[in-house]
Regions:
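Outer-membrane pore/translocation modules
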Residues: 105-220, 269
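Short loop/turn motifs that connect adjacent beta-strands in outer-membrane beta-barrel proteins
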Residues: 39-47, 88-97, 135-144, 187-191, ...
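Residues on the lipid-exposed face of transmembrane beta-strands in outer-membrane beta-barrel proteins
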Residues: 53, 82-87, 128-134, 148, ...
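Transmembrane beta-strands of outer-membrane beta-barrel proteins
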Residues: 49-51, 96-100, 128, 142-148, ...
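Outer membrane beta-barrel transmembrane domains
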Residues: 64, 70, 207-208, 214-319
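Transmembrane beta-strands of outer-membrane beta-barrel pores
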Residues: 55-61, 102-108, 134, 150-156, ...
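Residues that define the transmembrane beta-barrel architecture of outer-membrane proteins
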Residues: 47, 75-81, 120-126, 142, ...
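Outer-membrane beta-barrel biogenesis signature
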Residues: 28-52, 60
Length: 319
């Protein structure tokens, strides 16, 4: 084998290992616990409970490296259910509450560059969350909320598989934390907007470089930042439509490469660079029950699968 062939073979191995590690510890899903829907930042009265169920579908038809290179013959289909329970309880004079989120479902048809990632079914790491409104002014239709999320690594994980559901909600297989700040502003009787920023923190993990190679490496993911925006128009008291944006920045992930620079090198495995357009319509069928339908599409991606089409169907029940 020539030097060029050896280099090409090594590069191919590292690419396959990087992609496998993205799937193994980084998550390839269409769901995120801190992903907001329109008017979520308006607090409910103290003592209110809300049960929310989501069906989420994602069709991913291309994969992009961290340098922006498109890898052809790549795909992933995602079908998930997400159960979310929210309880509101004032803290002093400030609205506040707690929530728990549990995602389950399947990822199938996974492949990158023609190499199969297989399929998986299971549950994601549970999301535990608390939130509070340090400022809420119903007279001015202004609301400022701060929320925290914690993801203990309790989801479905098998180091022998490329795809694992454990990371599908938090974006990481190991311990993950998130701090989110959100603002809702109503302007006139019909228009409102929601804006949020959040930063995620990820704990290091260890695991095989590939499911079929028992070589353990340390995996690291830098913190990432996400920005979200919804512009909402209420056509009636019950029916609203919205257009939105979601963007991820940073979040580079890598593993310590044992065969590069004497074990001191790094191999990039992914990033949280993504820009998504969203559109939603919601309808209250009764004062307690709401339906929401959302469609979305990634307009740019780096360090993961690019979602060609995403669908969200949400039911919300207030009691």
């Amino acid at each position: 084998m020539s030097d060029n062939e050896r280099h090409a073979s090594a590069a191919g191995l590292l690419l396959r290992a990087a992609v496998a590690l993205v799937a193994l510890v980084g998550g390839l899903s269409a769901a995120r616990a801190q992903e907001i829907e329109p008017r979520e930042f308006v607090p409910a009265p103290s003592g209110t409970n809300i049960n929310i169920f989501f069906y989420l579908h994602g069709s991913n038809t291309s994969y992009y490296t961290t340098t922006g290179h498109k890898i052809s013959n790549s795909s992933l289909d995602v079908n998930l259910g997400l159960e979310r329970f929210v309880h509101y309880q004032n803290v002093g004079n400030m609205p506040a509450g707690v929530q728990i989120l549990q995602l389950f479902g399947s990822e199938s048809g996974g492949r990158v560059g023609g190499s199969s990632l297989g399929s998986t079914f299971g549950a994601a790491n549970t999301a535990l969350s608390a939130f509070i409104w340090p400022y809420a002014n119903p007279a001015l239709n202004q609301y400022l909320v701060v929320a925290g999320f914690l993801y203990p690594p309790v989801g479905s994980y098998d180091k022998r598989q490329s795809l694992n559901l454990a990371s599908s909600l938090s974006g990481w297989q190991g311990w993950t934390g998130d701090l989110q700040i959100g603002w809702d502003q109503g302007i006139g009787p019909n228009f409102s907007y929601d804006a949020s920023l959040d930063v995620r923190f990820f704990g290091d993990t260890t695991g095989p470089i590939q499911p079929t190679i028992p070589l353990s490496v340390r995996n690291h993911k830098n913190s990432d930042l996400r920005a979200q925006l919804w512009l909402n128009w209420a056509w009636t008291r019950a029916f609203s439509t919205s257009i939105g944006y979601e963007g991820f920045f940073g979040g580079e992930s890598y593993f310590d490469n044992p065969i590069q620079l004497g074990g001191r090198g790094h191999t990039n495995t992914g990033a949280s660079r993504e820009h998504r357009l969203r559109a939603a319509a919601s309808m209250f069928l009764s004062p307690q029950f709401q339906l929401l339908l959302e469609g979305n599409h990634d307009i740019a991606r780096g360090g993961g699968f690019k979602q060609q089409f995403g669908l969200v169907l949400r039911t919300l029940y207030i009691f």
